[in-house]
A protein has these predicted regions:
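Extracytoplasmic/lumenal acceptor-recognition loop(s) of multi-pass membrane glycoenzymes
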Residues: 97-101, 479-499, 512-582, 620-685, ...
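Hydrophobic alpha-helical membrane-insertion signals
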Residues: 7-97, 497-504, 515-530, 534
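Periplasmic/ER-lumenal interhelical loops and adjacent helix-loop junctions
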Residues: 53-57, 61-74, 107, 242-246, ...
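Active-site-proximal, structured, solvent-exposed surfaces of multi-pass membrane proteins
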Residues: 12-16, 659, 665-800
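Membrane-interface helix-loop-helix junctions at transmembrane boundaries of multi-pass membrane enzymes
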Residues: 236-244, 334-357, 468
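Membrane-embedded helix bundles of polyisoprenyl
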Residues: 27, 128, 132-145, 151-232, ...
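Active-site lumenal/periplasmic loops and adjacent helix-entry segments of GT-C-fold
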Residues: 37-146, 151-183, 207-211, 305-317, ...
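Contiguous transmembrane helix-bundle modules in multi-pass membrane proteins
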Residues: 196, 215, 346-505, 751-800
């Protein structure tokens, strides 16, 4: 049984309320302080580096306007939904599937919708401060059960909310949402187990699932580990009734929170990054020894900047969120607790998590067997480590000094990375150290050692003091604040040479949006900041985001264009610009000479406008056109990858089953025409496609409308990513959609004038809406029943 576990009802209600808000306030205030210098420096438009700059600011601002109906108009087609399809997301993507991983289910995002769109870039820091505060509040609620003095729960809340994981993941922003909400889920589980509360666990299951379905997979795994470890340690007695209660609330919570789940699952099943079942030894061992060292030290040392490694030259380290560091204390308190307990559930939980971290297939189970390595579940064991730390600090019988010395020696041992002799095989010369970033290494090591020394010193002089918890909390807050400033500063100023003009380009793009020529077309950019197309509300070939339409992930690789977390086809792939209806290219005046040297013919300089340089694509083809020829998939796959964009301007690629049904409307491309693929023939192909293109093409927030007049029945091609959520109508009649060109779309239209409408609604959304709509009133009735029963039995209001 947990040594300090006590019933919640024994805690004075007023005191708990006060301490809860104290935890919230301290964590939020500390976050506000360490963000403040950067907030002032940036004039309120805080920008950091990498994903935060390119995705988080941009996505929050863009989606704030999108959900309010800004941008493209509603579809005029009868019964079409509103705000379901985003043209500014890559080549166009369903908004729910593209953003449910980032923000679409986040309560923090929906809170930000109350603000004007123009405020969002300036509100990123206040929102982050709120998230840190919410994380502290949730951690306090969880931890107070396991301490005698609630001041230690406040201390543990600060350790968790300001942990290395939380500070590191400011870089990704939406990961902090998960850090903030998870403790409430664990607290609610404890309340159901120990206090027999009804409805609370189901509610927080729903909130966490809705917030981020991807992280929820890891939370389910962790809760199973947590439950089994507590059960085997005899922390509670499981009865059939209690198990049924937990199972029912788990199912009910998933049902309430599954609004985004069904569409997300259907989309993920088409995503090649999700799972790789052919790994073999890769299931059991990491390929590089350095990966193991990095994992072990990530629980002890403060984290590196997300995109900079101090030591490691091999393994997957950058951007992985690999840190479980607790500020000031590191693992010293947790190890002290470990040594003082036997058959303890917290020890078992941490031990299982450590094994999972070291076995690839177990590690990947926390994020849906994603084929890429990440450690983005470490926030969960971090909460348990915080609990172990405060338990050790509160117990006067626990030896705190010896574990701290041991952790200190491990930190000092990392100095070997700086002094180990290295021989250059090429020159034969010798040098010392294998450090990749010596300055950052010594800063990180210095903070780690300084924290441990302060920890030992403060424990030595204050442990017998009645205000020990408050003083340690103050020390943790000061240490976390200073380290967070340094950590963010390293990441921010490490890319200052590339990001210093970010705000200027983003704000200039808002002006350019009003000055671009009217019409619905795509754009391209050259060597400017990521996702500028979203500030212009235009579909852009250069896009940085992980969860665009899955068919994009098959279309681009088929052309030899890499597509992992971003789309960035090289400018030398000129034929792709005609195929995808790119009419304008945007760069900066400083990059004009470089662009003209690198690009092929076919671009005409127009003007310098709003800080940008604008070019027109001479080979622009309006969206929606027909072909005279087709090629089979086998022929396409046998062609030269680098010339496939040219081939796609000449012929449509049909799947084998579609050749039988639709090949009659086209002629199979003769072999002689498979080789004549160069720039001059491309310009003629563009002219041919342009001559048989749609007279009207209108983008809307649920898809698009087009009009075309054909001499004979033919397939009309649209360079829009194929998605099961689309329904096509030709002259008002529902029509089959063909998947062509390994990821794009076409429909069959009759001779004469045709009116074409593509209407998007995320596949699976109808079913998820029904489940959620049924589950919510069931939950309300369920909670009301137990509230009523409690009141009847006690004769007083009850908190259920």
């Amino acid at each position: 049984m947990e040594k300090f576990k006590k019933p919640r009802l024994l805690t004075p209600r007023g005191q708990s309320h006060k301490k809860f808000w104290q935890a919230v306030g301290l964590c939020a205030l500390t976050a506000a302080i360490f963000f403040l210098p950067f907030y002032i420096l940036d004039g309120g438009f805080f920008h950091y580096a990498g994903d935060f700059n390119s995705q988080q600011i941009t996505f929050y601002r863009y989606m704030n306007g999108f959900v309010k109906g800004a941008g493209y108009p509603d579809s005029a087609f009868a019964g079409a939904p509103h705000n379901t399809f985003s043209w500014a997301t890559d080549l166009g993507s369903g908004v729910m599937n593209a953003y449910s991983f980032y923000l679409y289910g986040s309560p923090f995002f929906w809170l930000s919708v109350l603000l004007p769109q123009s405020w969002l870039p300036y509100m990123m820091v206040p929102l982050l401060v709120l998230k840190f505060g919410v994380a502290g509040g949730g951690a306090f609620l969880y931890l107070r059960r396991y301490v005698k003095n609630e001041n230690y729960a406040v201390l543990g809340a600060c350790l968790y909310a300001l942990s290395g994981f939380a500070v590191y993941n400011v870089f990704f922003n939406h990961f902090v949402d998960v850090v903030a909400l998870f403790p409430y889920l664990l607290w609610a589980l404890d309340e159901a187990i120990y206090e027999n509360r009804h409805g609370l666990f189901a509610f927080w299951v729903a909130v966490n699932l809705l917030n981020n379905y991807f992280f929820f997979v890891g939370q389910v795994i962790f809760l199973c580990i947590y439950f089994v470890c507590k059960l085997t340690a005899k922390d509670f007695r499981l009865t059939g009734r209690k198990f049924g209660h937990l199972l029912w609330e788990s199912v009910l919570g998933v049902a309430m929170g599954c609004l985004l789940l069904f569409p997300a699952v259907l989309s993920l099943l088409q995503n090649p990054r999700t799972i790789d079942l052919s790994s073999g030894w890769g299931f059991l061992t990491y390929a590089k020894v350095q990966q193991y060292l990095a994992i072990l030290l990530s629980w002890i040392l403060p984290p590196d900047s997300p995109y900079l490694t101090s030591v490691w030259s091999e393994g997957v380290i950058k951007w992985t969120s690999m840190t479980a560091y607790l500020p000031l204390c590191s693992l010293a308190g947790a190890m002290a607790y470990w040594r003082s307990r036997k058959a303890d559930s917290k020890k078992r939980i941490v031990a299982v998590c450590a094994v999972c971290a070291l076995v690839p297939v177990l590690n990947s189970a926390f994020y849906a067997l994603n084929s890429s390595y990440y450690a983005r579940w470490y926030y969960m064991p971090s909460l348990i480590l915080a609990a172990m730390t405060v338990n050790a600090l509160e117990d006067p019988d626990v030896d705190l000094d010896a574990p701290a010395r041991g952790i200190g020696w491990i930190m000092l041992a990392t100095l070997v990375f700086a002094v180990v002799p290295v021989r250059d095989d090429t020159t034969g010369t010798w040098s010392f150290g294998v450090l990749k970033n010596p300055e950052q290494f010594f800063v990180v090591l210095g903070f780690g050692l300084l924290g441990l020394m302060l920890y030992r010193y403060l424990c030595g002089i204050w442990r017998q003091n009645s205000r020990f918890a408050q003083r340690m909390t103050a020390a943790v807050l000061v240490f976390a604040c200073v380290f967070s400033m340094v950590h963010i500063g390293i990441g921010k100023f490490g890319q200052w040479h590339t990001d210093s003009d970010l705000v200027e380009q983003d704000t200039n793009a808002l002006q350019l949006k009003n000055d671009l020529p009217e019409g619905d077309y795509r754009i391209d950019t050259y060597k400017i900041h990521d996702n500028i197309g979203m500030w212009l509300d235009k579909s852009c070939l250069q896009y940085f985001g992980s969860t665009a339409a899955p068919s994009i992930l098959s279309f681009y690789p088929g052309l030899g264009v890499k597509r992992d977390v971003r789309s960035e086809p090289e400018i030398t792939n000129y034929a792709l610009r005609g195929l995808l209806s790119v009419e304008y290219l945007i760069t900066t005046p400083e990059k004009r000479e470089s662009f003209e040297d690198e690009a092929d013919a076919g671009w005409t300089y127009l003007a310098d406008v709003d800080g940008y340089t604008l070019y027109h694509n001479d080979n622009y083809v309006p969206m929606g056109f027909t072909y005279d020829y087709y090629v089979t998939k086998a022929t396409y796959e046998a062609s030269v990858k680098t010339l496939r964009s040219n081939l796609l301007m000449r012929a449509l690629v049909l799947e084998d089953e579609d050749v039988k049904a639709y090949g009659q409307y086209l002629t199979e491309l003769p072999d002689a025409m498979l080789d004549d693929l160069h720039y001059d023939s491309y310009t003629q192909d563009c002219a041919d496609r342009r001559a048989h293109s749609c007279s009207v093409f209108q983008m809307n927030n649920a898809g698009f409308h087009a009009e075309i007049t054909l001499e004979k029945q033919n397939l009309v091609f649209f360079s829009v990513p194929y998605d099961d959520g689309f329904t096509a109508y030709v002259n008002g009649e529902k029509t089959d959609i063909l998947r062509v060109d390994e990821g794009l779309m076409a429909v069959l239209c009759p001779a004469g004038a045709s009116s074409i409408d593509f209407v998007y609604q995320a596949a699976g959304l109808s079913a998820s809406r029904v489940v959620t709509a049924v589950a919510i009133p069931v939950w309300v009735v369920y909670v009301a029943y137990f509230v009523r029963r409690k009141r009847r039995s006690t004769g007083a209001p009850a908190e259920e």
